[in-house]
A protein has these predicted regions:
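Trp/Phe/Arg-rich N-terminal binding region typifying the photolyase-homology
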Residues: 1-87
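Glycine/tryptophan-enriched, flexible segments
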Residues: 66-181
Length: 181
C-alpha cells in the first residue's frame, strides 16, 4: 500500500493524539515523512521527530559562516571539534514515554521463508536484534578495532564491525558505538 497508510489508521479512528518517529535522511523517506506529517496535521495529530541514525545532522556541522563544508577533511575536523565540545550523552527512554499507550500494530502474516518460496535456505551473516548488535559492538571494540586499518582489507579475517545493518535498522545507535570506542 501507500507508505504511511497503516500508521494513519489509528489517527483516523481517533485513537491517538501524537505520532513519534526517528528522522530518515534518504530523499524518498523525507518526502514520505513530509506527506504523513501533513496528513496527521489535518487529523489534529501532533508529530514529534527525533535525530537517531546520525550523531550530528547536516545542519549541525557547518562552516564558520554556516555554509555546508565542501571538503571531507574540513567536515571531519569540524565534526570532531563539535564531538569533543559537546560529547552528546546516550539518553535513556523517558519513563513517561515508556508508559504511554501505543496503538496496536495491524495483524499480518509472517513473511514466508526462502524455502517456502522455493529457494535454498539463507544463512544470515549477521544476527538481528539489539542484543546481538551490542554483542558485536563489544567484540569489535575489544578486538578488531585496534587493527582496523589492516583488518578491513583482509577478507580472510573478520576485521570489520559488520554493524551497518544494525545502524540502518535502528538496533544500534551511532552514539552508543562512539561512546564504546
Amino acid at each position: 500500500g501507500e507508505p504511511g497508510e497503516q500508521g494513519l489508521q489509528p489517527a483516523r479512528e481517533g485513537k491517538t493524539d501524537a505520532a513519534y518517529w526517528n528522522r530518515d535522511y534518504e530523499p524518498g523517506a523525507i518526502e514520505r515523512d513530509r506527506l504523513v506529517q501533513q496528513r496527521l496535521a489535518k487529523l489534529g495529530v501532533a508529530v514529534r521527530t527525533f535525530k537517531d541514525h546520525v550523531v550530528f545532522e547536516a545542519s549541525e556541522v557547518r562552516g564558520a559562516t554556516g555554509e555546508p563544508l565542501q571538503r571531507y577533511s574540513a567536515y571531519r575536523a569540524r565534526w570532531w571539534t563539535k564531538w569533543h565540545a559537546t560529547t552528546p550523552a546516550v539518553q535513556p527512554i523517558p519513563t513517561a514515554l515508556a508508559k504511554k499507550k501505543v496503538a496496536p500494530l495491524p495483524l499480518s502474516r509472517p513473511l514466508p521463508s526462502s524455502s517456502e518460496l522455493g529457494y535454498d535456505p539463507v544463512v544470515l551473516w549477521i544476527q538481528p536484534g539489539e542484543e546481538h548488535a551490542r554483542k558485536r559492538l563489544r567484540w569489535f571494540v575489544e578486538g578488531p578495532l585496534h587493527s582496523y586499518v589492516q583488518g578491513r582489507n583482509l577478507p580472510a579475517i573478520d576485521g570489520s564491525s559488520k554493524l551497518s545493518a544494525h545502524f540502518r535498522f535502528g538496533t544500534l545507535s551511532p552514539r552508543i558505538a562512539i561512546h564504546a570506542a
